[in-house]
Amino acid sequence: MLSRPKPGESEVDLLRFQSQFLAAGATPAVQLVKKGSRRAGDANLEQPPLQDHRDVVMLDSLPDLPPALVPAPPKRARPSPGHLLPEHEDPEERLHRHDQHITAVLTKIIERDTSSMPVNLPVSSGVAFPPVFHRSQGRQGKPVTAGKRSIFAQEIAARRASGAKVSPVREVESILDPPESAMTCEALTPREWGSQPPWNSYSFQGPHLVTGKGLKGQEAEQEAQTIHEENVARLQALAPEEILQEQQRLLAQLDPSLVAFLKSHSCTREQAEEKATREQRPGRPSAEVIGKEAIAPTSASVPRQENELEPETPALALPVTPQKEWLHMDTVELEKLHWTQDLPPLRRQQTQERMQARFSLQGELLAPDMDLPTHLGLHHHGEEAERAGYSLQELFHLTRSQVSQQRALALHVLAQVIGRAQAGEFGDRLVGSVLHLLLDAGFLFLLRFSLDDRVDGVIAAAVRALRALLVAPGDEELLDSTFSWYHGALMFALMPSQEDKEDEDEDEEPPAEKAKTKSPEEGNRPPSDLARHDIIKGLLATNLLPRLRYVLEVTCPGPSVVLDILTVLIRLARHSLESATRVLECPRLVETVVREFLPTSWSPMGSGPTSSLHRVPCAPAMKLLRVLASASRNIAARLLSGFDLRSRLSRFIAEDPQDLALPLEEAETLSTEAFRLWAVAASYGLGSDLYRELYPVLMQALQDVPKELSSPPPRPLAVQRIASLLTLLTQLTLAAGHIAPEHNSHSAEASLLAGSSSVTWTQVSGLQPLVEPCLRQTLKLLPRPEMWSALGPVPTACLLFLDAYYQAWSQQPGLCPEDWLQDMERLSEGLLLPLLKHPSLGSLWDSLGCCSPLCNPQSCAVAPETISSLASLGCAGGHPPLSLAGSASPFPFLTALLSLLNTLGRIHKGLCGQLATVLAAPGLQDYFLRCVAPVAALHLTPFSAWALRHEYHLQYLALTLAQRAATLQPPMSGTDAALCHGMALALLGRLLPGSEHLAHELMLSCVFRLEFLPERASGGPEAADFSDRLSLGSGGDLGCGRGALLAQACQDLPSIRSCYLTHCSLARASLLASQALYRGELQRVPALLLPVPKEPLLPTDWPFLPLIQLYHRASDTPSGLPPADTVGTALRALQWVLVLESWRPRALWAVSPAARLARLMCVFLVDSELFRETPIQRLVAALLARLCQPEVLSNLNLDCPLPGLTSFPDLYANFLEHFEAVSFGDHLFGALILLPLQRRFSVTLRLALFGEHVGALRALGLPLTQLPVSLECYTAPPEDNLALLQLYFRALVTGALRPRWCPVLYAVAVAHVNSFIFSQDPNNSDEIKAACRSMLQKTWLLTDEGLRQHLLHYKLPNSALPEGFELYPQLPPLRQQYLQKLRISGVLPNGVSDT
């Protein structure tokens, strides 16, 4: 920087300074601007605009110039923009120039600069409400001039006068704090709110102190802007300490009273301006709670920063002036008035730290930076008071308030939060689960305590929150809409599948006994412990049911509370048989529900909302009874006999919904639930006596069905009512077809089934002519998908009724079979066969894959908020149309159609071939191919179990129809038969609890059906060739080839089936209950509530199940004697496994190769003689050969956990002990010992043999030519475990490992020892190098010339040679050099020959 001239410097020095300045090229401090003439206006075009950046609106769509209608006069010159025209210019030309077109105004609109204009905001008060007018103020003020002015007008005039007095002071305030006053008074546009610079950057928008008043036009603005820029530059150059010093100096020069007065008024006005600005500020868009970006601080943080700069802040002035007449106002307690201040400004998040979630009163998640007005009631005085919304912690705190309204509000908000969380509205915006957080915080017992409140509003809010927690939205709607499906009334218990040990021990008891007896451990466990595993069990342990009964019976709550309580009771009844029993046995609970909400007489109701539901029929009350009756046969009988449900069913069914004194929607729902309750009772064979009384009503309702269906479009409630009516008639028809058993069979069963059905066949025989026209009418809408979807389950219910009708007709002993056979032919020719050829039916088959849970697992995705201790179907978001539960699902109709076709084919065998043509549909074939393909097991959730059960029904019925056709008709094609067999195998391993009858029937009819094995005539040659190549001691006998074994297995299929029916038998009680359900034996049905599906009925390795059971029986038998028929069981199991390995490898895809190897080893561990049987030897050898194929061997992983085993090394240790004890050198046994010793498997297995069971080496006499895998699998890569190498060398040197005893492992040990003693890797540790030299020295000094020759001259493995490896005729040069180097260093002695 150049210095100023000093005294004594001459002009020469100044010229030198000038030359240096010009040479440096620096910017001069002063710029000379020549003021041009009028015509030189272009010189100022490049100057920056004086105003700030403002909104500019450009209308590009308008043309810049108007259409040239009249030619404009030629221009004489081009004037500059700032040049004034001379006086003699033509006015018309001036008008044309300045007013050409609308585009001159609208193409560019610039916002007016308001930065320098003062904004006078209204003076705000510091209190929440306007001050009270005191008469003393009238005496202190000026006398009123006009007598007619009101007090309000006088007060307004006084405020205006006081505002006029304060306004001149604002210019002085700007001197003290220009940035704050400027930014506070400026109204920013919404776009500028996010880009406002921070205060500490000293970036001001324009001059506000110097206005340039007194100068001309543009010169005033230019000079003011120049002075402002110089001021800003000086401020930016100053350090914060210098700014404080200047501020102190300025304050010292002014009067202290003036400074205090100005600051007190400035603070009051700034607070009012900030409050007004916040109210006008638009809300920011929602943002996530996590993952926030760093945001620059806004102008709202200015007061805090400036307060830090000020050395001391004067006390705030009171909003009112205390008078001496007022009491206790002599001392002002400001800390007690702190809550009346305005909220602090919203701090925007500077980092990506997670913030506490806050919710609105409607349960909505609020973004952390959302600035909401205070009148919404979302601001409070807790932590982060400037943020709107309530956190979960604050809501929990509010539930303990002494004010009942606050408790009710908190529970209401929590209920809304739970509902939105279950609906998946929060998504990934929250870290973790809201429901898990609430339950861990004790929300469940908070609700239970709130139910004991004395305030009705709190009880109502607690009941609503309890419903939101327990009842998942959409679950009941789904179950109601599928009630009329094939076995749609059956439902899995909605209880957690992951239970503690006490609950698992109870599963062994029958369901009825479990409901009555409760273990003392569970009775003594606290509710909190029970709720951690099962929420509903924990709630029931807190006496929830008596409290709900008290609320219903005594407090008489409003309609919404009644509906919530009934919905909660329905959810409790769906939990389990025990919960349903407790609901039934709760004193006066069911009586209250029946008496208050199912009366037989009531006052007529209007169409509007009602104030009370007591003494008014309610559909949820009827539904509660239906769900209770579904839990067990005993509960249904107690409900019918103890609560006079017959009269109530008659009351609500005998009268049309339009005639009931109820709203139409409620009347139809109530009638539908009455039909469903009767249908559930009829499923047990109960309530049939009502049929005679209500027969005319049912016939009339059935005759009205075509009229209801003809009204386009059908109403959903009417459709559900029709479907429920048809389901009721289906169950009554099955009851009519039931034949009472003879009393001389079993006394217990005879006494149980003594009361036979009171419905006879003649009473239901007239229903079929009325139902069949309804089916024909609905099938006409099949080509119209939108109308077909609107029909819902009506076509399905019609098909199921015809199925039950013909099934019951064929069971009548006194009727002529020719009648029903002819009627079946009529139905088949007139309705079913044309339907099977209809193109629209083909589209339904084609959509099976899209709607299948197996083919489309995403349709069974887990709900957003899933709790392990509370089971739910997770239907909050609904289901897409193309899903099993969707409106366009083909599963219900096609399942009912296949059920009817099976019944007709079973009764009339002549129709089976014609009806089986449905199996040739391309859509069904493609669906089977996708289901047979190996896929990962679907995770079982309550919804996936429910959906898979309905899908398995369709697959089972299609396979049953195929089996009937294959038995009666000519043989099926090989491709179709193999596909059906693969589908049957896949289905057998997937069936869930409750389908025991289906699994039993599959094993009886489809799985072991010879017609489904078309490969029986073509699989022999290939298997024989492979067996000859890998024969293990067979001597080349072609009779033991795999082809002969498979042929023998096909002949023994009946014996194989008997073996698996014995060893894969299911629980007898469950099997009998399932048979009664699927066969329509209503008198034997125990319950419609299925057990919890924890896993499929059969394990994935069910083909090996007989072998596993033999192994466990042998382990549990203390005497060591083998079980009876051990050889036969093992033989049949191995035969079936060989069939599957050869012809159905996909059936064993879920069983890993390591698990298959472990199961084969179990055959040798059963006893000491089983593996010596020749058939067992041949089958195990064939299976071992299949396991040693390259594509299977590459997937053999012995380190992965195996089902049923603690670890494979433990099994292998037992296998070695058994081999030492009983093998006697058996080659097949030895092959299984050698297979896990490959180099790529764990070294633990090789250490177990060479370390603990070295004596077994003498019995491992398996020849190299019979080794099932390549020898290179054992020798490569070189062994790197020093302990194992030392064991190899010790076994070789001591003679425990000899080529004539164990040729395979001898070659392996020689290869690894040779590679180790000649290894020269420089990266080896000193220990490895020392062990290598020691082993080589000992090898050099061996007296056994043969072993020494093998260890030194080993070349590479070769199983064709007797030794198993090739030798160098003489040492290679590298080995000779290495030996010479060691000989020179003294490691090897001299005088010993190298050859």
Swiss-Prot record:
<dbReference type="GO" id="GO:0003677">
    <property type="term" value="F:DNA binding"/>
</dbReference>
<feature type="compositionally biased region" description="Pro residues">
    <location>
        <begin position="64"/>
        <end position="74"/>
    </location>
</feature>
<dbReference type="InterPro" id="IPR013930">
    <property type="entry name" value="RNA_pol_II_AP1_N"/>
</dbReference>
<dbReference type="GO" id="GO:0000428">
    <property type="term" value="C:DNA-directed RNA polymerase complex"/>
</dbReference>
<keyword id="KW-0238">DNA-binding</keyword>
<comment type="similarity">
    <text>Belongs to the RPAP1 family.</text>
</comment>
<feature type="compositionally biased region" description="Basic and acidic residues">
    <location>
        <begin position="511"/>
        <end position="530"/>
    </location>
</feature>
<keyword id="KW-0548">Nucleotidyltransferase</keyword>
<feature type="compositionally biased region" description="Basic and acidic residues">
    <location>
        <begin position="85"/>
        <end position="96"/>
    </location>
</feature>
<keyword id="KW-0804">Transcription</keyword>
<dbReference type="InterPro" id="IPR039913">
    <property type="entry name" value="RPAP1/Rba50"/>
</dbReference>
<dbReference type="InterPro" id="IPR013929">
    <property type="entry name" value="RNA_pol_II_AP1_C"/>
</dbReference>
<feature type="compositionally biased region" description="Acidic residues">
    <location>
        <begin position="500"/>
        <end position="510"/>
    </location>
</feature>
<feature type="region of interest" description="Disordered">
    <location>
        <begin position="62"/>
        <end position="96"/>
    </location>
</feature>
<dbReference type="GO" id="GO:0005634">
    <property type="term" value="C:nucleus"/>
</dbReference>
<feature type="region of interest" description="Disordered">
    <location>
        <begin position="498"/>
        <end position="530"/>
    </location>
</feature>
<keyword id="KW-0240">DNA-directed RNA polymerase</keyword>
<comment type="function">
    <text>Forms an interface between the RNA polymerase II enzyme and chaperone/scaffolding protein, suggesting that it is required to connect RNA polymerase II to regulators of protein complex formation. Required for interaction of the RNA polymerase II complex with acetylated histone H3.</text>
</comment>
<feature type="compositionally biased region" description="Basic and acidic residues">
    <location>
        <begin position="269"/>
        <end position="282"/>
    </location>
</feature>
<dbReference type="Pfam" id="PF08621">
    <property type="entry name" value="RPAP1_N"/>
</dbReference>
<feature type="region of interest" description="Disordered">
    <location>
        <begin position="269"/>
        <end position="312"/>
    </location>
</feature>
<dbReference type="GO" id="GO:0016779">
    <property type="term" value="F:nucleotidyltransferase activity"/>
</dbReference>
<feature type="region of interest" description="Disordered">
    <location>
        <begin position="34"/>
        <end position="53"/>
    </location>
</feature>
<dbReference type="GO" id="GO:0006366">
    <property type="term" value="P:transcription by RNA polymerase II"/>
</dbReference>
<keyword id="KW-0808">Transferase</keyword>
<comment type="subunit">
    <text>Part of an RNA polymerase II complex that contains POLR2A, POLR2B, POLR2C, POLR2D, POLR2E, POLR2F, POLR2G, POLR2H, POLR2I, POLR2J, POLR2K, POLR2L, RPAP1, FCP1 plus the general transcription factors TFIIB and TFIIF.</text>
</comment>
<keyword id="KW-0597">Phosphoprotein</keyword>
<protein>
    <recommendedName>
        <fullName>RNA polymerase II-associated protein 1</fullName>
    </recommendedName>
</protein>
<dbReference type="Pfam" id="PF08620">
    <property type="entry name" value="RPAP1_C"/>
</dbReference>
<keyword id="KW-0539">Nucleus</keyword>
<feature type="modified residue" description="Phosphothreonine">
    <location>
        <position position="321"/>
    </location>
</feature>
